[in-house]
Amino acid sequence: NKCDDRITRRVYLSKEKEVSIKVVYFINNVAAHNNTIEIPQTVNGGYDFSHLSLKGIVIKDEDLSNSNFAGCRLQNAIFQDCNMYKTNFYYAIMEKILFDNCILDDSNFAQIKMADGTLNACSAMHVQFYNAAMNRANIKNTFLDYSNFYMAYMAEVNLYKVIAPYVNLFKADLSFSKLDLINFEHADLSRVNLNKAILQNINLIDSKLFCTWLTNTFLEMVICTGSNMANVNFNNANLSNCHFNCSILTKACMFNTRLYRVNFDEASVQGMGISILRGEENIPIDSDTLVTLQKFFEEDCTSHTGMSQTEDNINAVAMKITADIMQHAD
């Protein structure tokens, strides 16, 4: 068959081969008379796909642990039910790639360029995503414990039912993103850009959001108990049923902000700038009296502090969020 960019073939892998495997599919850098290439094994027992340009490959139920895809160009590729432990994708380019029910723990996705990629029902713990470009990525039903997204560009990403305690998102860009049913407990979201994002059912207990940008952001049922949110920017945001009790909000900004049933009990609010939108009226509030204005907020229905939310109540809500995330997890 001629080597045509419209031709896609399934990749066949077999760990029973001692030295190498044969892969039959379209590869840009294979001569027109031969679209079969042998993929050598790496020193760690995986396969070396490095710097190949692969289109339309489908790999199912294979052991690709310790394989090397560094510098690869992967277009419309599918990896399903694969063990990809410690796989290297450093500097790979991915277009509409799908990882479905794969083990990606301890893998390297640093400095990848991914567009419209999907991680579904994957285990991606301790993975390096630093400086990765993952715009419009779709990550759902996935474990991201302890993974590193330092300075990752993830604009317009969709995160749904994700377990990600201790994840590092320092200086990441998640603007215009949608996050729902996420466990970010003990995570670092400092200096993260969440402008114009939608956050719903988020557990951020004991997390860091120092100097994080949340302008024009919608937050509903976001629990930040005991979190460090100093210098965070909520300007023009809309907050509903959120909990900031026992958190540090020193020098935080909440100008032109709409608040409904927001809990600031025992929060540190020194130097906080806040003005609440009530209809078209913008009402400035002294941060020193913020927590004591319960009656005003109840009647105004703009915000509600002192909601009789005990620590046990709030922990129960956080546990329910985690339980909802885990409902369909294996």
What are these regions (language model features)?
Residues K2-C3, I7-T8, Y12-K17, V24-A329:
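Tandem repeat scaffolds
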